[in-house]
Amino acid sequence: MTQQERTYKNLLAHSARYPELQPRDLFKYLYQSAFGCEHLVTSKEEAVAYIQCEYESMELLGNTAVEPLDGAYCRVPLAILREGLSPKTLGELFCRSAKKEPQGREALQEKLQVAREMVLSGRFSFSSSDFDDALASWRANGFEAVRHSEEFRRAYHPAYRVISKAFVPFLPLFARLDRLLLQKGSAVLALEGGSASGKTTLSKLLEELYGCTVFHADDFFLRPEQRTAERFAEIGGNLDRERLLSEVLIPLQKGKAVTYQRFNCSAQALEEPITVTPKALTVIEGAYSMHPDLSSYYDLSAFLKIDSDYQRERILKRNTPDLAKRFFEEWIPMERIYFEGTEIESRCDLVISIADDDFSFEKRA
């Protein structure tokens, strides 16, 4: 599908969703599609305060469905806050989504051309002359950001923030975390999933959003003396889970500082002990982190499920041919045996499926 075809499809869906939209509402949609929210961000503190104030003043909460724009951004309704997402987290995502789009003007012009062709073919409720007059005025003002029309506001009561689509797959996870932290004051999260599914990237984002402590399962590889045939015959035996349990999870459960040793793959030995004082949120990320021997120590768990073709593409892009071969012939088969043998996916609280740009969620009670 070409970008023009995608724009046509998205505009068709947008007009069907909002039959009362006026030319300026169409312009706003296209502007946000091309430029995102770069023009709106002043400071993180102000962004959070505005979200809180607007949410509290809303008379109609509406639905919580995220609305895709025609590009790398989407509209997240403020009503989503009632599902547990905090104004602070949404404000953080909003600010992190604000960036300069150097190709924004060019993209906007291309989208406007598609929109005009659709107007001429009668795809919108307003006339082509109304569209052309509004477009001429908008162009004269330098294609500045516009507000929704009064007609649109009366009909639909819009209240949302524009954020990057890259954050959308993780909104249910953020909402669960925000609820947990509000209720308990602290939480331990397991990020489980296959190779190249984005666990480390997500843990870095969580660290930036929540200032959390992150422990990596890769630091608990088996030591050479543990790599026996009997050990590898165990389902999920490819992790020193005993050490992860004794050095990290049990101290966390007791509210104590964690002193542990990272396994150095190059030296094939444990490094010197380090002591970490956990924050309110602690994340354990990596395959095997939700092993049945460990799962009871978590407050929340998420499984990142990656499409096999996309997984292969990512691994080939990130690694040397020799290392990629080890992934395909050694580590991924072991992960699959573990996933199937322990039914980890079904035992996690949240499943986030990732297949290229296609994301979906399976919420669990």
Question: Where on the chain are the PLM-derived regions?
Answer:
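Conserved nucleotide-sensing/catalytic segment adjacent to the nucleotide-binding pocket
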Residues: 210-216, 222-275, 281
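Short hydrophobic/aromatic beta-strand immediately N-terminal to the Walker A/P-loop
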Residues: 188-190
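ATP-dependent NMP and nucleoside kinases share a basic, alpha-helical "lid"
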Residues: 270-318
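Conserved lysine of the Walker
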Residues: 199
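N-terminal pre-Walker A segment at the start of P-loop NTPase domains
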Residues: 155-182
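Long, basic/Gly/Ser/Thr-rich N-terminal segments
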Residues: 1-153
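P-loop (Walker A) phosphate-binding loop of NTP-binding proteins
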Residues: 194
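Post-Walker A alpha-helix
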Residues: 202-203, 207
